[in-house]
């Protein structure tokens, strides 16, 4: 899709590279950063975690040495890293960059990209003791029962949440316990996005579906060869809350089931591949319906050519 807002007309203030998993985003981001003095900023909710270098397909140490990389492997798995955390850290990174440095945001998490321009709701931080208390009370209870509890405490929020949406129900309960207020009352106020109103080049890498499917399957096998199982074994040994994002990363539940003897290695690999393929499909759907016309749906090579033309043009053209 071509931009209708004239963003091609001048040098972009930042490059945004999105797309499904295994579409070539990281390689393109590094290529642009090397060529134009850029800093690659992670925009993927799993690649932030230190525990998942292999299974999240983070750039290698050698790749990270070729250009500055930020927000990769910088968060401990025990942290429930949110869109709010991402937006605040991205804003700090942008404020620290020199004027001639090019921010290159790379990842597959749509809400992260949206927060850069549209901002996010100004939700309060939940103190860890309260979070742990709510999770302890929820342990062993079905999600529908938690939703019933939310209905008693915050009926308006409960009405708009699916009774089966455990994560959002839990989040609403945590906010209410911490503040005594509905999560909806905080969502009425938004923090501005750090890239709002700035000229951007936004590309979504869109491989053919069958090619992408083969890449996903092959990459999971390669991850297993490169130590993904050992990585997950170390994560399992930490005995973290199973609701934490790091514990629900694609591949983690199946590999833990294999380590526990519930699945064979082959079954765990197939489950990880299938989960990742379904996630890629959801990424296509989400971006198509949520991110508007200002994104170029394209290939890595075409995206490189577009970026090269814009970034090489004399200032003012």
UniProtKB/Swiss-Prot annotation:
GO terms for biological process: tRNA modification. The record marks 109, 131 as: Interaction with substrate tRNA. It is an enzyme of class 2 (transferase). InterPro entries: Dimethylallyltransferase (IPR039657), IPT (IPR018022), P-loop_NTPase (IPR027417). One of its GO terms (molecular function) is tRNA dimethylallyltransferase activity. Keywords: ATP-binding, Magnesium, Nucleotide-binding, Transferase, tRNA processing. It catalyses: adenosine(37) in tRNA + dimethylallyl diphosphate = N(6)-dimethylallyladenosine(37) in tRNA + diphosphate. Its EC number is 2.5.1.75. Its cofactor is Mg(2+). Belongs to the IPP transferase family. Monomer. Catalyzes the transfer of a dimethylallyl group onto the adenine at position 37 in tRNAs that read codons beginning with uridine, leading to the formation of N6-(dimethylallyl)adenosine (i(6)A). PANTHER family: TRNA DIMETHYLALLYLTRANSFERASE (PTHR11088:SF60). This is tRNA dimethylallyltransferase. It comes from Methylorubrum populi (strain ATCC BAA-705 / NCIMB 13946 / BJ001) (Methylobacterium populi). The gene is miaA.
């Amino acid at each position: 899709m071509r931009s209708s807002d004239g963003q091609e007309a001048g040098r972009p203030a930042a490059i945004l590279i999105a797309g499904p998993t295994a579409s070539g985003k990281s390689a393109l981001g590094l290529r642009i950063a090397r060529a134009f003095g850029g800093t690659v900023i992670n925009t993927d909710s799993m690649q932030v975690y230190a525990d998942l270098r292999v299974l999240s397909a983070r750039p290698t140490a050698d790749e990270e040495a070729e250009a500055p990389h930020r927000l990769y492997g910088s968060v401990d798995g025990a942290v429930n890293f949110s869109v709010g955390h991402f937006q605040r850290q991205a804003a700090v990174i942008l404020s620290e960059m020199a004027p001639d440095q090019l921010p290159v945001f790379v990842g597959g998490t749509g809400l992260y990209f949206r927060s850069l321009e549209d901002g996010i709701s100004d939700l309060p931080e939940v103190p860890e003791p309260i979070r742990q208390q709510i999770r302890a009370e929820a342990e062993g209870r079905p999600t529908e029962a938690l939703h019933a509890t939310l209905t008693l405490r915050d009926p308006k929020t409960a009405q708009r949440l699916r009774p089966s949406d455990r994560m959002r129900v839990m989040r609403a309960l945590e906010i209410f316990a911490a503040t005594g207020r509905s999560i909806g009352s905080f969502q009425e106020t938004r923090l501005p996005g750090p890239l709002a109103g700035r000229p951007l080049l936004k590309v979504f890498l869109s491989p053919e579906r069958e090619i992408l499917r083969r890449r996903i399957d092959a990459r999971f096998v390669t991850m297993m060869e490169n130590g993904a199982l050992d990585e997950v074994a170390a994560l399992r040994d930490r005995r973290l809350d199973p609701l934490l994002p790091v514990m629900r990363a694609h591949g983690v539940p199946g590999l833990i089931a294999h380590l526990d003897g519930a699945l064979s290695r082959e079954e765990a690999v197939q489950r990880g591949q299938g989960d990742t393929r379904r996630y890629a499909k959801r990424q296509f759907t989400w971006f198509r319906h949520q991110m508007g016309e200002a994104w170029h749906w394209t290939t890595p090579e075409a995206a490189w050519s577009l970026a090269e033309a814009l970034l090489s043009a004399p200032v003012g053209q």
